[in-house]
Swiss-Prot record:
GO terms for MF: 4 iron, 4 sulfur cluster binding; metal ion binding; protein-macromolecule adaptor activity
GO cellular component, one term: chloroplast stroma
Coiled coil: none
Annotated compartments: Plastid, Apicoplast
Stored SUPFAM superfamilies: HesB-like domain (SSF89360)
Record protein name field: Iron-sulfur cluster assembly protein SufA
Chief location: plastid
Disruption phenotype: Dispensable. Disruption does not affect the establishment and progression of erythrocytic infection, parasite development in the mosquito vector and pre-erythrocytic growth.
Gene: SufA
Known pathway: Cofactor biosynthesis; iron-sulfur cluster biosynthesis
Keyword field: 4Fe-4S, Apicoplast, Iron, Iron-sulfur, Metal-binding, Plastid, Signal
PROSITE patterns per the UniProt record, alphabetical: HESB
């Protein structure tokens, strides 16, 4: 009887935690290797949350682009049929340091209602940022490199406390 109750409570806990994660709460509750017991947030993380809120209120850009990134985006816009390029940017678990960037082209109807939209009118380019990823992406710089090894879009993240050698994975 005790084992059945334990298994039921364990299964219910898993369902609740996965539904919280799906709803987007996991990024604010837990970041790998950052919080101590009982998910106590440290001061740096709370200051970063406040800075993100201020930037959003002031309509400031969450992410900045280098000239190389702007030139590549201009090239991509001229190559596609739809004259508005939309890229979805999010951070997900993975990589050797715990978190990794994901940047994919999407259609306008795929933008979610809680995404943060950053529009670059001069480039005819829209960046749709996943709401749970904003805290990790805030103040990043998007760069582009034509290098044969590790070429492509790269993120310069001043918030990262750890980075892997290839630059694809980070932790805050």
């Amino acid at each position: 009887m005790f084992i059945n109750i334990f298994l039921f409570l364990f299964a219910a806990t898993i369902n609740i935690s996965s539904s919280l994660r799906y709803a987007g709460f996991s990024s604010y509750i837990y970041t790998p290797n950052k919080y101590i017991n009982n998910n106590v947030m440290d001061r740096k993380f709370i200051r970063r949350l406040n800075a993100v809120d201020e930037s959003i209120k002031n309509n400031e850009h969450i992410i900045k682009l280098t000239d190389n990134a702007k030139n590549k985006i201009k090239q991509l816009v001229t190559e596609i049929e739809d004259k508005n390029l939309i890229l979805k940017l999010c951070v997900e678990n993975g990589g050797c340091k715990g978190l990794k960037y994901k940047l994919n082209p999407i259609k306008k109807e795929d933008i979610e209602t809680d995404d943060y939209i950053q529009q670059f009118d001069e480039l005819k380019f829209i960046l749709s940022i996943d709401s749970t990823s904003v805290i990790y992406i805030y103040n990043n710089i998007l760069d582009y490199s034509n290098d044969l090894i590790n070429g492509g879009f790269k993120f310069i993240n001043p918030n990262a406390t750890k980075k892997c050698g290839c630059g694809k994975s980070f932790n805050v």
